[in-house]
Amino acid sequence: MAAAGQLCLLYLSAGLLSRLGAAFNLDTREDNVIRKYGDPGSLFGFSLAMHWQLQPEDKRLLLVGAPRAEALPLQRANRTGGLYSCDITARGPCTRIEFDNDADPTSESKEDQWMGVTVQSQGPGGKVVTCAHRYEKRQHVNTKQESRDIFGRCYVLSQNLRIEDDMDGGDWSFCDGRLRGHEKFGSCQQGVAATFTKDFHYIVFGAPGTYNWKGIVRVEQKNNTFFDMNIFEDGPYEVGGETEHDESLVPVPANSYLGLLFLTSVSYTDPDQFVYKTRPPREQPDTFPDVMMNSYLGFSLDSGKGIVSKDEITFVSGAPRANHSGAVVLLKRDMKSAHLLPEHIFDGEGLASSFGYDVAVVDLNKDGWQDIVIGAPQYFDRDGEVGGAVYVYMNQQGRWNNVKPIRLNGTKDSMFGIAVKNIGDINQDGYPDIAVGAPYDDLGKVFIYHGSANGINTKPTQVLKGISPYFGYSIAGNMDLDRNSYPDVAVGSLSDSVTIFRSRPVINIQKTITVTPNRIDLRQKTACGAPSGICLQVKSCFEYTANPAGYNPSISIVGTLEAEKERRKSGLSSRVQFRNQGSEPKYTQELTLKRQKQKVCMEETLWLQDNIRDKLRPIPITASVEIQEPSSRRRVNSLPEVLPILNSDEPKTAHIDVHFLKEGCGDDNVCNSNLKLEYKFCTREGNQDKFSYLPIQKGVPELVLKDQKDIALEITVTNSPSNPRNPTKDGDDAHEAKLIATFPDTLTYSAYRELRAFPEKQLSCVANQNGSQADCELGNPFKRNSNVTFYLVLSTTEVTFDTPDLDINLKLETTSNQDNLAPITAKAKVVIELLLSVSGVAKPSQVYFGGTVVGEQAMKSEDEVGSLIEYEFRVINLGKPLTNLGTATLNIQWPKEISNGKWLLYLVKVESKGLEKVTCEPQKEINSLNLTESHNSRKKREITEKQIDDNRKFSLFAERKYQTLNCSVNVNCVNIRCPLRGLDSKASLILRSRLWNSTFLEEYSKLNYLDILMRAFIDVTAAAENIRLPNAGTQVRVTVFPSKTVAQYSGVPWWIILVAILAGILMLALLVFILWKCGFFKRSRYDDSVPRYHAVRIRKEEREIKDEKYIDNLEKKQWITKWNENESYS
C-alpha cells in the first residue's frame, strides 16, 4: 500500500522553476526575482504557502515543503521530509522548522513519510498545517504478525511556527484507531490535501486512500474564539459518518479520491459526540451517483461562502479518478440532521484527464458569488494538440446545473492545470486573478489570467517561464510579501528550487494634448519664425493615479510629443517640425510626478513647413510617456525597490489631428456630401490591366473558377447633388473621403488600378498586413461633382472548390455630414468549371450478323455470341487534379436488350488505361453468363456464311429498310458506372462486347441495316454544389448489316430477259445503219497523181569507198517515182 500511496500523489508529478514571459506587473527582471534553493533530491518546493506572522514580530514568510528532505536526528529514519521557512530577502537560505523530532520504532515508521507534502496558512496571525500522507502505524513489530497501515497525519503549528497550545502538534490523525485494511482506513493517506476555510473557522483534511481509495473529506472546527464562547456543537463533520464509517454514504463513485469529509468541533471530549452523518443516497432528497473505488475524493480541497448560498459555507473537493475522467463535488453541512449532503457534482469530459487534480475558489467578476476553477492536467485532444486543461465555472447566483464552463487549453504534453491558484488582485484593478501551472511546457511555465467584470480573460496577461525543469508544479499567492500593497506570487518546482515574483505597482497616467490654434488657416501668417509663417503651440499634460489611494511615490517620466509618425514611416517627408529640433518632428522632456493627481505639463512650438503640397490631410500629433528608471535604486527591507509599471490596458498615447481649414462647404460652412458607390465584378487578363465584366446569372455575377489568378472589383464613386433642382442640399466636398473594403478569407488584396489618372483626386489604397482589408483614400476633399472609377485587384489563390460565393464588404466614410453611408456587400457566385471531356469510338464501327440462331443455354464462349465490338471512351482532364474535389464517374448507357427482353449487346469485359484499377458497377452486368473469353483477334467476319431458306427474294427495285436503336425509344439500357479514381490528365476505358447474333437474325433480318446508339457522360460526386461540367457527354454509333448470304439471289423473271435481248438487237442494228450511212464501211483508194512512196535512189556503186575513204565529189541525187526491181538499192 506504500507504493500505491506514493503513486497516488506522484503520477502527475513533474517540473520546476521560473522566469519571465509576456510581461505585465510581475517583475521578472533578474535583480528583482527572489530565488530559494533546497538540498538536492529533497523535492524542495513541492508545496508552498505564504504566511503572515504577527507575534512575536510582524514577519512575512514563504513556507516551503520538502517531502524528501533528510530526517532530523531523533526521527530514526533516513528521509522523512520537512518544512522550511524562507525570509523575503534577496539572499540567505531557508531555515528548516523543527518539529516531529522523535520516533517510536515499535509503533510507527517515519521513513519516507513525506512530511511537507502539503502546507497551508490560516492567514495573518493564524495557524499553519502541514502533513505527511505516508506516515505509518505499526503493530507487532519484528514478529510474523507485524502489520503496517499508511494512515498519514498532520501537524498544526502556531503563527510563530512552534507547538504552543493544545490544538498544536501531530495528533491530527483521525484514521488511527479505526478499522484497518485498504477496504476501510488502513491506507487512509490523510494529508494529501489540507486547508483552512477562509473564515478561519474550520480545518479541512482530505484522505483519498479511504475505502479502497474511494476517499473521504473531514472538517473540524479550528477557532479558539468559538471555544471560549462555549460553542461546541459544530462538528466534526465527515463524509461517510464518523461513527457509521459507511462508504456507501460517500457521494462519489468508488476510486474517486474524493476524501472522506469529516467536520468536528475542536472542543469535543467524547469522540462519539456531535457526529453528523451523511444519509444514504436513497434517503437524500436529491440523489447523486456513488463515487467508484480509486476515485481519490479529497485529493484537492477548497471552500467558501457564496458558492451555493451566500450564508452557508460549501466545501469543494476534487476526485481526479472518478468515473475514469474525474469529478469535483460540492458538499454542505445539514445543521438540523448533522449530515453532509452533496450539492452538486462537476464531471470531467476527457477520459483519464485527472479532472479535479487541483481546485480553486475565486470571485473572478466580483459579483459576490464565488466561481470555481478546476484543473485537468492530463486532458488531451488529438486534433487540437492540447495537453492539459483548466475549466472555469462562472457562478450563476448559486445555480450550477446549466453552467457551461470556459475551457483554457495548454500545449501538448505540458500538464497544464496541475496547479491552479487564486493569487489575489495582483494588478489592483478590483478583480481577483488566477495562476495556472504547466510544468512540462518546455522547462515549465505559469500562466497569469486576470479577472474582469465579464469573468475570466481567456488570454493570459503574463507567462512566467522556468530556468530549471518542472517549474510551475506548485503555486502560492494572494499575500503581499514585500509590503508594497500588491500581492506577490511564488512558484515551486520538482528541481529543489522556488522563485518569488514581486508585483510591480500599476499606475495609470492620464495624457491630454491641446493645440492652439486648433485649425490651420494657410491665409493667416505671422512672424513666428516658421518658414511658412504658420506656427502651432502644442501642450501636453500628465497626471497619474494608482491603487491603493495612499500609494504616492515620486515618479520620474519622459514625455514625448511627436507629429506625423505614420507618414514618416511610409517614407514621406513631414510637413511640420518642432522649433530648434531639426527636421524630425519629435520633442522629449523629463518630468517628475510627485504624487497622485498632480498635473505636470510640457509645451513646445510646432512649425509648418513652407510650400507643402498635401494641404488636405490633417496633421496628427501624439503624446506618450515612459517611466524613467533611476540610475541607482534604493533598497526596501534589504530588497531592491520595485518600480511601478504603466497599466497595459490603458492607451499608450494621446492623439489629436490638426485639420486645415475646409473649403467647398457651402454658405453655412457645413459640408453635406452625397457619396454614392457602384460596383461590378471583373476578370483580369493575365498580368495586363485589361478587365472584362463577369457574366450575370439570375442577377448575380458568376465567377467561373478556372486558372485565373486574379479578379477585380470595379468601383465607381460619385459626389453629386441628389436633387439637381436643389443643388445646395447636398453634394458638398467630402472631406477625408475613403472607401474601406473588407475581403473574405478566400480573397487577398493585391493592387489597385485607376481607370483614368486624375492627380487632383489623390486616390491611394493601402492594405493591412494580411491583405484582408484595403483603405482607399478618395481625396481630401473629394470635391463636388467628382467621380472616380478604379479597380481593386484581388488574388484568388485561396479560392477553393469549397468556396460557394464571395462577399466583399464596401463602406464609404467621410468627415462631412452624410447619414446614408450604410455598408454594401458585393456578392458573386463561384462556379467550379471542370475541364473534363469524354469522347468515344467503336471498333469496328460497322459489323455484320448472319448464320443460324443459337440459344442462350447452348453458348459456352463469347465467340458463339456474335461479332466483336470494342467501345473505347477517352476522358481528358485539362484542369486541376480531382483529388481534393471528389470522384469523377463515367456513366455508360449500355444497350443491353431490346424491348421484348432479347439480348442486344453482351458486355464481356471492362479494361482501363491511365487509371487505377477500375471496378464498374453493377458487376453482375459484366459477363453475366460467365462465357469463356476469346484470346484470338477477330477477323472481319467470324460467322460462317450458310444458306438460309427463308423464301426471301432480293429485288433491285425494293425500298432499303433501316432502324435506329437507342435507349430512349426501343432498347432497355443499363447504367454502367465506372469511377475514374486516379485520373490525372487523360485515361481510357475499353468495353469489350459482342453483338447478339441470334437476336438480329430473329428480329432484324428483313432490314438492310441498323444503327445502335450508345451515350456516355461524366458526373462528379463532391460536397460542393457549384460544379459545372461542360462537354461532359458523348454518343457512339455502330452500324449493323446483315451478311450477303442472309438475302439469297432467286433469279430474274424470263420476260425481263427477253425484253433485254430484243432491245439489245434493235440498238445494235440501229448503230450499224448509222455507221453505214456515214461511210464507215467504204474502202479508201489513193489518187494516181500522188506518189505512193517517197524515196531517194542511191546506187550501190556510189556508196563504194576507195582507199578506205569516201569519194569526195558525190553526184546529186535524183527523185525516183518508179521502182526498178532489177536495180540494186541495198
From Swiss-Prot:
Site positions for Cleavage: 634-635
MF (Gene Ontology): cadherin binding; insulin-like growth factor I binding; integrin binding; metal ion binding; neuregulin binding
Membrane topology summary: Single-pass type I membrane protein; Lipid-anchor
Residue ranges of the motif GFFKR motif: 1079-1083
Domain of life, per lineage: Eukaryota
Tissue expr: Integrin alpha-6/beta-4 is predominantly expressed by epithelia. Isoforms containing segment X1 are ubiquitously expressed. Isoforms containing segment X1X2 are expressed in heart, kidney, placenta, colon, duodenum, myoblasts and myotubes, and in a limited number of cell lines; they are always coexpressed with the ubiquitous isoform containing segment X1. In some tissues (e.g.
Alphabetically ordered keywords of this record: Calcium, Cell adhesion, Cell membrane, Cleavage on pair of basic residues, Disulfide bond, Epidermolysis bullosa, Glycoprotein, Integrin, Lipoprotein, Membrane, Metal-binding, Palmitate, Phosphoprotein, Receptor, Repeat, Signal, Transmembrane, Transmembrane helix
Ranges of the FG-GAP repeats in the UniProt entry: 30-95, 101-166, 176-229, 283-339, 340-402, 403-458, 459-518
Lipid positions (S-palmitoyl cysteine): 1078
InterPro entries hit by this protein: FG-GAP, Int_alpha_beta-p, Integrin_alpha, Integrin_alpha_C_CS, Integrin_alpha_Ig-like_1, Integrin_alpha_Ig-like_2, Integrin_alpha_Ig-like_3, Integrin_alpha_N
Segments on the Extracellular side according to the record's topology features: 24-1050
Keyword tRNA-binding: no
Glycosylated residues, chain numbering: 78, 223, 323, 409, 770, 787, 930, 966, 997
Subcellular location: Cell membrane
Family membership noted in the UniProt record: Belongs to the integrin alpha chain family.
Quaternary context: Heterodimer of an alpha and a beta subunit. The alpha subunit is composed of a heavy and a light chain linked by a disulfide bond. Alpha-6 associates with either beta-1 (ITGB1) or beta-4 (ITGB4) to form ITGA6:ITGB1 and ITGA6:ITGB4, respectively. ITGA6:ITGB1 is found in a complex with CD9; interaction takes place in oocytes and is involved in sperm-egg fusion. ITGA6:ITGB4 is found in a ternary complex with NRG1 and ERBB3. ITGA6:ITGB4 is found in a ternary complex with IGF1 and IGF1R. ITGA6:ITGB4 interacts with IGF2. Interacts with ADAM9. Interacts with RAB21. Interacts with MDK.
Protein name as it appears in the record: Integrin alpha-6
Source organism phylogeny: Eukaryota, Metazoa, Chordata, Craniata, Vertebrata
